[in-house]
Curated annotation (Swiss-Prot):
GO terms for biological process: ATP synthesis coupled electron transport. This is NADH-quinone oxidoreductase subunit K 2. Its main location: membrane. NDH-1 is composed of 14 different subunits. Subunits NuoA, H, J, K, L, M, N constitute the membrane sector of the complex. GO terms for cellular component: NADH dehydrogenase complex; plasma membrane. It catalyses: a quinone + NADH + 5 H(+)(in) = a quinol + NAD(+) + 4 H(+)(out). It comes from Geobacter sp. (strain M21). It is found in: Cell inner membrane. It comes from the Bacteria. Keywords: Cell inner membrane, Cell membrane, Membrane, NAD, Quinone, Translocase, Transmembrane, Transmembrane helix, Transport, Ubiquinone.
Length: 100
């Protein structure tokens, strides 16, 4: 069995990749995928600590995070589809051009 440090290092690397992707990309779908990667990195940390400490609290919290992430995915994709129909682009710089 791997030590908890290995899981935490992997989680930190995944979170860093997601953060870099959010900060450097302009495509809304890629940014959305990077945010999901960051959420999964946090979930990995919760699971690692849950297994290390021997309780189930982290696993239950991961279940709730995954539920919220699924709802976020549905709403986010619906907004992207509506934005694409309006502007025919999913570039985040075009969002500033929208008026209410």
């Amino acid at each position: 069995m791997l030590a908890i440090e290995n899981y935490l290092i992997l989680s930190a690397i995944l979170f860093a990749i997601g953060t870099i992707g959010v900060l450097t990309r302009r495509n809304a779908i890629v940014i959305f995928m990077c945010i999901e990667l960051m959420l999964n990195a946090v979930n990995l940390t919760f699971i690692a600590f849950s297994r290390h400490l021997g309780n189930i609290d982290g696993q239950v919290f991961v279940f709730f995070v995954m539920t919220v992430a699924a709802a976020e995915a549905a709403v986010g994709l619906a907004l992207m589809i509506a934005f694409f129909k309006n502007r025919e682009s999913i570039d985040v710089e075009d969002v500033n051009l929208m008026k209410l």
